[in-house]
Amino acid sequence: MNNFKRVFLIVMDSVGIGEAPDARDFNDVGANTLGHIAENMNGLNMPTMASLGLSNIRKIEGIEASAQPRAHYTKMQEASNGKDTMTGHWEIMGLHIEKPFRTFPDGFPDELIEELEQKTGRKVIGNKPASGTEILDELGQQHMDTGSLIVYTSADSVLQIAAHEEIIPIDEQYRICEIARELTLDEKYMVGRVIARPFIGEPGAFERTSNRHDYALKPFGRTVMNELKDNNYDVLALGKISDIYDGEGVTESIRTKDNNDGMVQLRKSMDKSFTGLNFLNLVDFDAKYGHRRDPVGYGKALEEFDEQLPEIIEQLHDDDLLIITADHGNDPIHHGTDHTREYVPLVVYHNQIKQAKELPIRKTFADIGATIADNFGIKLPEHGESFLNDIK
C-alpha cells in the first residue's frame, strides 16, 4: 500500500500502562496508571480501545483482551531523563532530553523570588504548589489589597503568576511574565513554562479569564514538526500542542476547552483537506484527575474518550493513519501528586489492516516521530526508529 496522506496523533496525557524498567530511579516502583484506575473502578468499560488491542498490551481489569485486535499495538519506554509533558512530547517528535526540567515541590528558591520582586517592583505571595482555583480563594483578597503577585507551581515544571485584571493590567501581567521567563532560563532554575493566569471577579467568585498566556521554552533542537512545516506539509496542533512546542513547526493551532471539546475539534478538523499531521493532546486526564489523585474521575474520563472514539475511526479515509499514545504516567493511586515513570500504550490503526499484530516494544517515544518522518519522506530525526513498514 501507499504511504498515508494524513496522520492523526492523539496523546492521552498521562495514561501510563505500568512501571518503566527505570521506575526506581524516579521513585515510581509499582506505578500503573491504567491498571490501578481499572482496579479502583472494579473494571473499566472501554470497548473501543479493547477492540484496538489495549488490553493485549497488558491485562486491564474490565477490558477484554481481543482475540482479533483491529489495530497494531505495543508499549513504549521513555528514553529521556524526565517524566513531564514537555519531555514526553518533545521525545515523541524526535528529541532526546538529557537534563530534566526542574520541578519545585517546595516552591521556588528565595534567590529567584527576590530577583522577581526586585525587577517587577511587586512583592510575591504564595510560592508553593497549588491548584489554580484554590490559591485564588486563599490569596485573591490579599492580592487585591496589596497588589502582590500570586506565584505558584504544580507537579509540572511551571511557574504560574496569577493577578486580577483590575489590579494589574494585562500588559503589565505579560511584562512581569516575560521577566520571570528571562530569569528562569538560568540553568539552575530551568523551568519548562511560565504562565500568566489573569482573573477577574470578587472574593468567593473569582474567575480565570481567557487571557492566559504561556511562555514556553523552544524545543532544544529541530523536531519532525519543523521538518514537516519546512517541506510544506500541514501541522495542525490541537489543545495545548502549540504551547508545548512554543509554536515551532505548527501551521495551524486550534484551542480546546477540555477533553470533550478536543475530540469535537478533532472530528471537525477531519473534514479539512490537508496533507500532514493532526496532533491532539487530551490534558484533562492529567490536569483534572491524575494530579488530583481522583481515580474515579479519571476512569470516567477514559470511558467518555472511548465512547467518542468510534466517530473518529468512522471518519478515517483509507489513506489516513491514527496513532494513540501517551506522554508519561500519572497514577492516581500512587504516592504524592507527581507524574509517574511508566511505559505508555501505542495503538496504531488504519482501514487497510488485514492482520493486526503486536509490534516490538519501543525503546523511545521518538519512534513515532521517525515513523511520521519516514511516511512523508522527510529528514529522519536523530533519535527513533521508524515502524512504518511494520504497520502497512
Curated annotation (Swiss-Prot):
Pathway: Carbohydrate degradation; 2-deoxy-D-ribose 1-phosphate degradation; D-glyceraldehyde 3-phosphate and acetaldehyde from 2-deoxy-alpha-D-ribose 1-phosphate: step 1/2. Its EC number is 5.4.2.7. One of its GO terms (molecular function) is manganese ion binding. CDD domains: PPM (cd16009). It is found in: Cytoplasm. Binds 2 manganese ions. The keyword Transit peptide does not apply. Signal peptide: none annotated. Gene3D superfamilies: Alkaline Phosphatase, subunit A, Phosphopentomutase. GO terms for biological process: 2-deoxyribose 1-phosphate catabolic process; 5-phosphoribose 1-diphosphate biosynthetic process; metabolic compound salvage; nucleotide metabolic process. Mn(2+) 2 binds at residues 286, 291, 339. Its main location: cytoplasm. Mn(2+) 1 binds at residues 13, 327-328. It catalyses: 2-deoxy-alpha-D-ribose 1-phosphate = 2-deoxy-D-ribose 5-phosphate; alpha-D-ribose 1-phosphate = D-ribose 5-phosphate. Belongs to the phosphopentomutase family. Isomerase that catalyzes the conversion of deoxy-ribose 1-phosphate (dRib-1-P) and ribose 1-phosphate (Rib-1-P) to deoxy-ribose 5-phosphate (dRib-5-P) and ribose 5-phosphate (Rib-5-P), respectively. This is Phosphopentomutase. It comes from Oceanobacillus iheyensis (strain DSM 14371 / CIP 107618 / JCM 11309 / KCTC 3954 / HTE831). The gene is deoB.
